Amino acid sequence: MRAMILAAGLGTRMRPLTLDTPKPLLKIADQPMIEHHILRLKAAGFTHLVINHAWLGEQIEAHLGDGQRLGVEIVYSAEQEPLETAGGIAKALPMLSPDGQTPFAVINGDIYCDYPFAQLPLTLEAPKMAHLVLVDNPAHNPAGDFALQAGSVVDDSDESEVISALTFSGISVLSPALFDGIHSGEKAALAPLLRAAISEGKVSGEHHSGYWVDVGTPERLTEVDQFVREQNGV
């Protein structure tokens, strides 16, 4: 299975740190954020990676190159301007799923998480079109995004049968079919596609209760940096 790291955001919430440096190259414990993902994906057996980029993307390519230094193969999907999540994935589909049928993993580049990527399902059983990893709600998203019911992701259901609403972690396995109708180079958000599939019972999920942070602000970057340094005994 191939994996995509989403790295095309402008990083506006992270300014001024991202005025001259793309967010994926901001450092956590002296290592670029994106390298943490790459090394953990490699350890889980993902060695063919696709990275999209837009803002200062040439710096990402210059730093990571073809991935050989990190023991992986990296190809890039350059966007002249950010295409949003679904648009970026749709543009990269030929690299992610050459046969147009095999699912692939997608990881948001601006999260830090101890989720074991080797736990991701390598296949999606029909009629499933997506598998989402959900996490406990952070302070900045107290209402959550979705809920879980018997292994399926749902929007709304009877409270007695549903685990409390959880937050989408930005970690998923997706089917190319989810992007039918999205043309290469078209801007498109992922949430509407997921909600449509959820309404048809086509999305499975799991709850990861470990460490997870949306590293979207300088404050959260500092928080994660301190956490990782403590974990590493630095």
Please provide the spans of the model-predicted regions:
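Catalytic-core segments of class I nucleotidyltransferases/pyrophosphorylases
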Residues: 46, 105, 112, 118-125, ...
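Conserved beta-strand segments of alpha/beta enzyme cores
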Residues: 24, 73-75, 129, 202-204
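Short catalytic helix/loop segments, enriched in acidic residues and glycine
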Residues: 20-33
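N-proximal low-complexity "stem/linker" segments adjacent to membrane-targeting elements
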Residues: 1-5, 10-18, 25
